[in-house]
From Swiss-Prot:
Keywords: Coiled coil, Methyltransferase, Mitochondrion, Mitochondrion nucleoid, Phosphoprotein, S-adenosyl-L-methionine, Transferase, Transit peptide, tRNA processing
Taxonomic lineage: Eukaryota, Metazoa, Chordata, Craniata, Vertebrata
Cited function: Mitochondrial tRNA N(1)-methyltransferase involved in mitochondrial tRNA maturation. Component of mitochondrial ribonuclease P, a complex composed of TRMT10C/MRPP1, HSD17B10/MRPP2 and PRORP/MRPP3, which cleaves tRNA molecules in their 5'-ends. Together with HSD17B10/MRPP2, forms a subcomplex of the mitochondrial ribonuclease P, named MRPP1-MRPP2 subcomplex, which displays functions that are independent of the ribonuclease P activity.
Catalytic activity: adenosine(9) in tRNA + S-adenosyl-L-methionine = N(1)-methyladenosine(9) in tRNA + S-adenosyl-L-homocysteine + H(+); guanosine(9) in tRNA + S-adenosyl-L-methionine = N(1)-methylguanosine(9) in tRNA + S-adenosyl-L-homocysteine + H(+); an adenosine in mRNA + S-adenosyl-L-methionine = an N(1)-methyladenosine in mRNA + S-adenosyl-L-homocysteine + H(+)
Localisation per UniProt entry: Mitochondrion matrix, Mitochondrion nucleoid
Organism: Rattus norvegicus (Rat)
Gene Ontology cellular component terms for the protein in this record: mitochondrial nucleoid; mitochondrial ribonuclease P complex; mitochondrion; nucleoplasm; nucleus; tRNA methyltransferase complex
Name of protein: tRNA methyltransferase 10 homolog C
InterPro entries, sorted: MT_TRM10-typ, MT_TRM10-typ_sf, Trm10_C_MTase_dom, tRNA_m1G_MeTrfase_euk, tRNA_MeTrfase_TRMD/TRM10
Amino acid sequence: MNVTVRFLRPFARYLVPYTFHRTRSNSYSRVLQRYVSSKVPSLPCHNKDSTSPPEQLELDGWKTTMKSSIQENGVSVVSDKDEDSLAATRELIEMWRLLGKEVPEHITEEELKTLMECASKSAKKKYLRYLYGKEMMKKAKQMKKEMKAAAREEAKRARSLEPSTGEEQRDFMFLRLWDRQTNIALGWKGVQAMQFGQPLVFDMAYDNYMKPSELQNTVSQLLESEGWNRRNVDPFHIYFCNLEVDGAYHRELVKRYGEKWDKLLLTATEKSPVDLFPKDSIIYLTADSPNVMTTFKHDKIYIIGSFVDKNTQTGTSLAKAKRQNLATECLPLDKYLQWDVGNKNLTLDQMIRILLCLKNTGNWEEALKFVPRRKHTGYLEVPEHSQAAFRKLKKTKTLNSFRKGSLNVHMWKR
């Protein structure tokens, strides 16, 4: 080994720099290779022999692809979390059912999501108890329906076994009016109302003021109101204004009507009533209005707020009408009825029946028959001279000086 070192020592000054240079160049090449490999685009090398244009990298397409892949991964993670939470909720319901608690046998995806949104365990139990009672009522109705059908079949079978006397007359001079013919006739009336009828607006901008149960109650009243209007002799042209697509109202209406929603003879729009009609022709009906309705005006557009208020949020619709500078009126309940208990907010179906009766007859006594009897004790009869004196005294400050009942106002029941 010593001999080899001695032999190579004269050549050291030539070999060592060459070795250092090779090592340094190798390190530089490795650094350059890492730098180039970390960059996605590479410099195009122009070839004189090739006639094709250089290949360019589409940065926008690459960014879109990367973002979409990230979003898909995020959506998959969120969907996995939702599925896990849904499975855990189903297991919890099954465990409570095995423990003998009141939980429904069948639950939909929407009800399951509503259950997951409950904040506390007691709220979940209350909601499951509500669904259980609803399911039991549905089962009881189905059982009654089956029992009635069985009784009808039994009666029909018994009549078929009885000997016929030949005295039964089955031919009549009047044709039978089938349900399909009735629906066609009512449909023609609805078409005429949409073309020439007086508009009646239901304001659907109150979904944020109600709980889910109150909103479902409101939609039930809307369905009943639409039915009463469709069966009337001279129906209104109903507008559902401020109805957001895929909103709470819209989802519940589509759920209730199903395929018939697109066939309804009414106008559903996201626009506000002030965008469709002039403000001077609009009257907002609210129980909190200081202006009392005297007569039904056929040239006005009446608005009814689609709002079920169980928390007694007084002044909500009146405040909205004032913000939009709309005229407001309330029904003359104190003028014709001896009010007993409860507030003066009526349901939507009661309001439309009152307005339909006023539109057709103009008689307040006939129209106010649709006010529930539990809220008043009877009608008031006011003579003409007392009405004139009352109108004069109302303009003065001496009205409060009269005792109650001094204007010859007496109550009578029908």
